[in-house]
Amino acid sequence: MSPELDTDPSAFPSAPPASLDDPEVIVEHDWRAFQRVERMADHWDRPGWSDRQRKYYWMHTFPDPGQLLQRTEHCQRALQHLGMDPVPADGLHVTLLRVGAVDQVSTAQVEHLLDLTQELPVSAFHVLAHPLAGSRGAVRFSLTPWKPLVRLHAALHAAGKQAGVPGGAPTTAFRPHLGIAYSNQERSAPAVIDAVEPLRSLPPVPLHFTTVDLVELRRQDRTYRWRTIRSVPLPSSATSRTALA
């Protein structure tokens, strides 16, 4: 059973979609939430972050983005006139969960966390990245279905609690997405929404989640960069079935 998602004003969208499985419901929900945005914020003007800070995060990264990169660059070219900060090819990622600031997490805790995640109760899975929607600070792909991503978040959150790390937002507030461009100033949202809308007819791109990455994340030149601590493999469905037999 997947954990329940709740309404959370700090999340975007604040309320979860009616279904965590139905792609049409999720994509439409993301789009309607973006359409209601009146002003976009400067993504980089965020409390708790500076260029000198380093934080541990669980992410899914794309060493070989392939078709995802093609679709991303197509959308970025179409939005170039907006002057947003495009996510570079080697910066594409899906953020899963914050672990904690580097100075708040000991080496022993990192090792314990990695030990705890060697046998996550979540099998490798596939999702689709759908062009295109956005938030108050970014333009982003919608991801479907949410259910396996929510299960992965919950498993990582549980491991973090067991390891005693500061942790991030609860699973109830998790809203999966994949950002492709960040707003670098306060701006009126309707112009961005109008530019994004024609791109919604593009077909989705399949993404394969076979690993989850613990990274040391930093902000650099108005993008995110990271050092991968370890890529943790997710068991195949066949392996999981055998283990449960």
Kindly give the residue locations of the regions a language model identified.
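Histidine-dependent nucleotide/RNA phosphoesterase domain, centered on the 2H-phosphoesterase fold
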Residues: 2-245
